[in-house]
Amino acid sequence: MVQTEPVVFFNGEIKPESLVGISIRDRGFLYGDAVFDAARTFNGTPFRLSEHVHRLYDSLRYLRIDPGIEPKEMEDWSRRVVDHNYKLLPPGQDMWVMQRISRGIEPILPGDVMRPTVLIETHAIPF
């Protein structure tokens, strides 16, 4: 089956964008306790992606957020999302690829463990 909907990477897996939801208890949503970076593409290739991911990980270290995946994996997943979603754009269009990592869902019960929320998404550049 041909996928006609954009996909995202969400917490370890590629999913259709419409099937992803962020918890109202996510610290990124509640308090802005998150880091993001964005790189644009040229002809479907992310521009200086490794530099962008390096900067993202510098910020994550500063805030002491462990995304649970290595920088190389973040790059690989970003490229996979771009590769899929770029095919859905009209000819000549490019996109942003964004990595968003929050500290995770606020624990509410004893024994709850906070794990990061990791999202990689794309948006068409509006020109």
Residue ranges and their predicted role:
Residues 1-127:
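Conserved alpha/beta cores of soluble small-molecule-handling proteins
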